[in-house]
């Protein structure tokens, strides 16, 4: 069977939601709209996303609706019960998560902390939700003096362990995180990821290094990535994609340091010869701007991404398909620091399209995975609807 597209390049703009989901009230997220609220008052345009049809999905500041969009577009709602990165990505590739991962707004249970201390022989300090930079400013000097483990969490279902690289060598920190991953597989904890967060520097001038490592749970079933890999296709994971799926279904993993580095890595991969998918997560939208409620920074990051699209498109082959989407919302104007339950935008573009139009929106994140699976003639996910026949 001939494939309409030899390669699919899937880009997740982490947290760039496009309006409250139908069940937003269940998550106390009524009125959330990451894109609209981020772009309100922004004094620059997004000409490339506009041409593709982003402004046709929903009314947005600085992004107009266009009469002849160059891409197909829609918005999708989440069927799974969480609004975290892992849940969103797993659903994109065909899994629905009906038991949510747990978040720990008051820190982790004393029982778990004691287990970590006994297992590692090191005391645990902090044990609260915090930003990574804030927590090392607060506890970094103490950690250097004592060798204690700085354990903290966020609005996500994660347990993070920070340590100075000169005090706890990377290999030891990674080993500790692997052991904590095993501990927290106990269903009573339901923690999505354990994250090693090494840092360097002196008191008052600490910086986190790029030696971060995530220890995820393995997806509880086969995803579209597994079916692609089993079918002999390339699955190139860029950024934190490899960690999100714990390496399952991935044939090559490329690390990134930032959104722009992620785009640089994607450009290199687009110029390579392969058949299958590249799958890029651009985490800065979420980690640097959404959680920190930095609206101007968030808007500028979207502009920086928009600026890179002509370079990407000029390097595409005729039978390439680019899908731009998100995994949840993180409205920088919402109260608190948590993700927001939102629709995700979906834009599908190929050089061979003569133009595009709206696609059905009454379906779920898994429609992205279904479209990719359908293209490569591998097992379709149980959920979602393939748009492949409409992409002409």
UniProtKB/Swiss-Prot annotation:
Protein's GO biological process: 2-deoxyribose 1-phosphate catabolic process; 5-phosphoribose 1-diphosphate biosynthetic process; metabolic compound salvage; nucleotide metabolic process
Biological pathway: Carbohydrate degradation; 2-deoxy-D-ribose 1-phosphate degradation; D-glyceraldehyde 3-phosphate and acetaldehyde from 2-deoxy-alpha-D-ribose 1-phosphate: step 1/2
GO molecular function: magnesium ion binding; manganese ion binding; phosphopentomutase activity
UniProt keyword terms in alphabetical order: Cytoplasm, Isomerase, Manganese, Metal-binding
Entry keyword Ribonucleoprotein: no
Cofactor: binding comment: Binds 2 manganese ions.
Binding site for Mn(2+) 1: 14, 327-328
Keyword set includes Metal-binding: yes
Gene Ontology CC, one term: cytosol
Residues the record lists as binding Mn(2+) 2: 286, 291, 339
Cofactor(s) essential for the protein: Mn(2+)
Record-annotated membrane-spanning stretches: none
Any Pfam family: Metalloenzyme
Reactions the enzyme catalyzes: 2-deoxy-alpha-D-ribose 1-phosphate = 2-deoxy-D-ribose 5-phosphate; alpha-D-ribose 1-phosphate = D-ribose 5-phosphate
Major location category of this protein: cytoplasm
Compartments where found: Cytoplasm
PANTHER family reported for this sequence: PHOSPHOPENTOMUTASE
Family, as annotated: Belongs to the phosphopentomutase family.
Protein known as: Phosphopentomutase
Source species: Staphylococcus aureus (strain NCTC 8325 / PS 47)
